[in-house]
Amino acid sequence: MNPEERVVTWLISLGVLESPKKTICDPEEFLKSSLKNGVVLCKLISRLLPGSVEKYCQEPQTEADCIDNINDFLKGCATLQVEVFEPDDLYSGANFSKVLNTLLAVNKATEDQLSERPCGRSSSLSATTSSQTNPQAAVPSTTPEQQSEEKAAEMTENGSHQLIVKARFNFKQTNEDELSVCKGDIIYVTRVEEGGWWEGTLNGRTGWFPSNYVREIKPSERPLSPKAVKGFDTAPLTKNYYTVVLQNILDTEKEYAKELQSLLVTYLRPLQSNNNLSTVEFTCLLGNFEEVCTFQQTLCQALEECSKSPENQHKVGGCLLNLMPHFKSMYLAYCANHPSAVNVLTQHSDDLERFMENQGASSPGILILTTSLSKPFMRLEKYVTLLQELERHMEDTHPDHQDILKAIIAFKSLMGQCQDLRKRKQLELQILSEPIQAWEGDDIKTLGNVIFMSQVVMQHGACEEKEERYFLLFSSVLIMLSASPRMSGFMYQGKVPIAGMVVTRLDEIEGNDCTFEITGSTVERIVVHCNNNQDFQEWMEQLNRLTKGPASCSSLSKTSSSSCSTHSSFSSTGQPRGPLEPPQIIKPWSLSCLRPAPPLRPSAALGYKERMSYILKESSKSPKTMKKFLHKRKTERKTSEEEYVIRKSTAALEEDAQILKVIEAYCTSASFQQGTRKDSVPQVLLPEEEKLIIEETRSNGQTIIEEKSLVDTVYALKDEVKELKQENKKMKQCLEEELKSRKDLEKLVRKLLKQTDESIRAESSSKTSILQ
């Protein structure tokens, strides 16, 4: 590592120089531009020697300001007895090597001072160095348990001794506490457990991943860690500033809790007794502000108790993690209500401003109330910054270090959830308060409260085109809206009733992440793609809760009293229900199972006797008449039909007529017996056993007769109706386009006629003037 890179790493590790977002191609030029104004140097000397620089220009605008900052740094370096450079050497960049030599000397001088104190990390580094120089001292073999313990021990050390692994395969999380990784990702392991699962951090997120999906990175392959560079150890400085940062957290937390309590006592509670707002409006304005105040006071007390223990036993991160469920419930509820509170502030701004100023607030009083109600959001953002600063000044071996990292991640996640929830509730309020274009039916406010709302991408029916929609879920209906072309409002696109809705997850199919479909008897198939997994899980939970609610209980009974008793007995039992099963329909016993196949057409059964008598009468005249009245049978009986056609003798037809008479008598007797039991046993229609003859004409003009069940026929008719609807929709679109084109053409013709008329008039007037 060259001197420039060493200095850059050192400054970043001390926190006085911001880490560049991109890879540094030329460290020397980067240093020149970063150190030129002297601000970084003043921060450095203040960090190394607190109190050496009392005041410096943090935003220098002129050359004189920059030179003054550099001189302040050089004065501080005089106490370290190192060779210094001239201010112009740095500002002009002409002799930058002297600047590097001074910085390296400062690093060496502070290292010598720090080396006089014991440091666990330095001893671990020296032990590692000695083991590398003497490989014979290494243990030749270890058991898997010992290796796991060694890896866990490595993670308690600092710098390059932290276990770092590289993903060999892609892994997709299936639970909330797991970590999704891609091949080649670098993961910092935070916990090693037996059983094949390790805990690690990737891109600021901590979770579990399978250990056989990764491989350990060799020391030569590991990325450079600023804390791991020998000679840049700042443990005593870290220890000194840890207490300062912790005290800052306590002070700001007390001040924040005090401000909330002051707002509640001085303004909000007196406002409740005032007549400026109704009870509903005041409830919207206040929300759960009182609960937030109480919770923040509890948090202050808990943090103070943590700070009273010895420094190596501080559990600030653990305390915050224990209270994180309360954080989420309090702040998410506050965020959900905040857009309604802002709406109340907007509607009654004049009255509230007068009230605030009468209570002693400075003008404009409404601004004090608005900013005070927004402080919980600003404080939530500060938690992340404060904890990051605390972690920066905390030793990696501190028992609270891992909890601090987890708390940072938890607060980042909570902050993102709160921001999304505020935007969603604000959009929801906008939809409910503004008119919706092409809305059908009663006002949307009559549907009740919105259970959930989000922006999705949907596919309707068999169409592959994806459309952006806003879904609003109410207790009885799902509303679909779209943004207007100019993004000035919302347009109504349809609704789906909850009754009869069937929701199916599609996320298990590859390529359909965060996807589900909606089907039903009254709606065409809708495929919905959610923007993230959180929205997807929320939609699944809410829709399943509404569609799979308590089922109604009914049973066939002869009297209404038995039906009522059955219903009451069902509702009184609180036992858990099993899986839904189709109703058990008791089929009545009948002689119809011994009958031959019923008539293939319903119309044939109506005039059966008349037709049979007519057939018998005409059969003696011509065999063609018999063939005319007999319907075509099933395909597998084609041979018998051909044989029947061949038989043309009158004797054979008479024999068949006698057989038909026997069948008729049998059916008549069976129907009579069945009729005697009609009052006692209900008749049940079984669609799958009903048959129909369907005549279809193909494109080549050939007519085909097919036998279909009633169910198949209904579904075929449903498909035909669907096709007709689509064709009708296309025809409407074509008609609208044609009407629009005709109107445009009419406008164009009128315009041309008008221009022609004007030109003719102009010519005639010019001719008249010439003649005169």
Curated annotation (Swiss-Prot):
Domain PH: 443-548
CDD domains: CH_alphaPIX (cd21265), PH_Cool_Pix (cd01225), RhoGEF (cd00160), SH3_alphaPIX (cd12060)
Biased composition (Polar residues): 134-146
Compositionally skewed regions (Low complexity) per UniProt: 122-133, 557-573
InterPro entries according to UniProt: AlphaPIX_SH3 (IPR035788), CH_dom (IPR001715), CH_dom_sf (IPR036872), DBL_dom_sf (IPR035899), DH_dom (IPR000219), GDS_CDC24_CS (IPR001331), GEF6/7_CC (IPR032409), PH-like_dom_sf (IPR011993)
Keywords linked to the UniProt accession: Cell projection, Guanine-nucleotide releasing factor, Phosphoprotein, SH3 domain
Compartment(s) of residence: Cell projection, Lamellipodium
Residue list for modification Phosphoserine: 126, 225, 488, 640, 680
Domain SH3, residue spans: 160-219
Family annotation (SUPFAM superfamilies): Calponin-homology domain, CH-domain (SSF47576), DBL homology domain (DH-domain) (SSF48065), PH domain-like (SSF50729), SH3-domain (SSF50044)
Positions carrying Phosphothreonine: 133
GO terms for biological process, alphabetical: intracellular signal transduction; lamellipodium assembly
Pfam families hit by this protein: betaPIX_CC, CH, PH, RhoGEF, RhoGEF67_u1, RhoGEF67_u2, SH3_2
Residue ranges annotated for the DH domain, each copy included: 241-421
Subunit structure: Interacts with PAK kinases through the SH3 domain. Interacts with GIT1. Interacts with PARVB. Component of cytoplasmic complexes, which also contain PXN, GIT1 and PAK1. Interacts with BIN2. Identified in a complex with BIN2 and GIT2. Interacts with PARVG; the guanine nucleotide exchange factor activity of ARHGEF6 is essential for PARVG-induced enhancement of cell spreading.
Name of the protein in its database record: Rho guanine nucleotide exchange factor 6
Protein species of origin: Rattus norvegicus (Rat)
